[in-house]
Swiss-Prot record:
Keywords: Amino-acid biosynthesis, Cytoplasm, Isomerase, Lysine biosynthesis. Homodimer. The keyword Isomerase applies. It is found in: Cytoplasm. This is Diaminopimelate epimerase.
Length: 270
């Protein structure tokens, strides 16, 4: 049986998403498989992550799938994209998005400036692999563990401030997904600080390298503040643009753009 699914494709600084309203999905769909099909850049629409949203009385629920069909707990760029989509559909400027019971407060200042308050973060040293497990990797790629920190921003991030070459970043990002290091995988952030700005590349679990990562920007900003490498406000720089970062009463707030790319119908064969 072939069915039609309405979709919107958007991106935040090149980090791209296929977004669908839950009301357009049949209960019989295998959502993990649907995510893999629609995310495929050759046989589907193509995206970094597949987003399902549902309207409730005073908030919007967002469900995130990676391209491998696994679920994700947070995505900052997708949140900005969804907030803009809701704004374009309804005119609402203040929007609450819920992801895995985490409340994200969004404000659409205009079509090119959407802010997201992701709340507070925690620095969970219990996530960090024991020194003997990670020492060989750190030594081989000259990673200073004193400048490496785990951040929980709703999803797990490891922020590395040591400078690595791009080819080494890929190797390290892959190796850190080993279950004996991080049981559920981890998002790996390679951060370099210049003039109070963080230049960032992120290996996202279940995806690989993406052109930008909003939650990674928030986690790296928080890590930079904690380690004294930057002060607020600051900016996180990606290949296709920047996110402006600030801290208010212990909450991390990012601001950036979100772009509408296309909308249409996807033909899904079960």
């Amino acid at each position: 049986m072939i069915s039609k699914i309405n979709f919107v494709k958007m991106h935040g600084l090149g980090n791209d998403f296929v977004i669908v309203n839950k009301r357009d999905l049949l209960s019989s769909y295998d959502l993990s498989q649907l995510a893999k099909n629609m995310a495929d850049r050759h046989t589907g629409i193509g995206c970094d992550q597949f987003i399902i949203y549902e309207e409730h009385n005073d908030f919007y629920e967002m469900i995130i799938y990676n391209i491998d069909g696994s679920s994700a707990k947070l995505c900052g760029n997708a949140t900005r994209c969804l907030a803009k989509l809701i704004y374009l559909d309804t005119g609402k400027k203040d929007i609450t998005v819920m992801v895995c019971n985490k409340k994200l407060l969004c404000n659409v200042e205009d079509e090119n400036n959407i802010s997201v308050n992701v709340g507070s973060v925690s620095f969970n040293e219990a996530w960090m692999p024991s020194r003997d497990k990670i020492w060989e990797l750190a030594e081989r790629y000259m990673i200073d563990l004193k400048e490496t920190i785990c951040v929980d921003i709703g999803n797990p991030h490891l922020v590395i401030f040591s400078k690595l070459e791009p080819q080494d970043q890929k190797i390290v990002g892959e190796k850190l997904q080993a279950k004996e290091l991080f049981a559920d995988g981890v998002n790996v952030n390679f951060a370099e600080v210049k003039d109070n700005k963080i230049y960032l590349s992120v290996w996202e679990r279940g995806v690989g390298f993406t052109l930008a990562c909003g939650s990674g920007a928030c986690g790296s900003f928080a890590a930079g503040l904690k380690l004294g490498f930057i002060h607020a406000p600051s900016m996180v720089v990606f290949k296709h643009g920047i996110l402006t970062m600030k801290e208010e009463n212990g909450n991390i707030i990012m601001q950036g753009s979100a772009k509408l790319v296309a909308q249409g119908e996807y033909y899904y064969e079960q």
